[in-house]
Regions:
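Polybasic interaction patches
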Residues: 12-14, 23-30, 35
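Short, structured protein-protein interaction patches enriched in aromatics and acidic/basic residues
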Residues: 31-55
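Poly-acidic low-complexity segments
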Residues: 15-20, 79
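Short beta-strand-to-loop capping motifs
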Residues: 8-14, 44, 73-77
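Generic C-terminus detector
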Residues: 49, 53-88
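Short, small-residue-biased leader/transition segments that mark boundaries at the very start
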Residues: 1-2
């Protein structure tokens, strides 16, 4: 029996495009575990806050007024060490 997990990655020094590419790579890598969703907040190229929501079906980026630099990976049997290498 697997339990749902959440892994938090704070204060990432990555661009919007780098975070999007990282999310796609994590979903594609089965060694990361069973990833359901990646969500978080990031700044775009114009220093405006964006909310990120990624699932296997869709990726959404929406503007928001405030946020903090965090990406959360949600799933089961997550390999924290493997996922962490994508954010290094």
């Amino acid at each position: 029996v697997y339990k749902r997990q959440s892994l938090y990655f704070m204060n990432l020094d990555k661009t919007k495009n780098e975070i999007i590419e990282t999310a796609e790579k994590i979903f594609a890598d089965t060694e990361c575990g069973k990833v359901f969703r990646i969500k978080g907040f990031l700044m775009d190229d114009d220093d405006k806050w964006m909310e990120l929501n990624v699932t296997h079906q869709e990726m959404r980026l929406e503007p928001i007024t405030e946020g903090q630099k965090v990406v959360i990976v949600i799933g089961e049997n997550l390999n924290e060490q493997r996922i962490g290498t994508f954010f290094a």
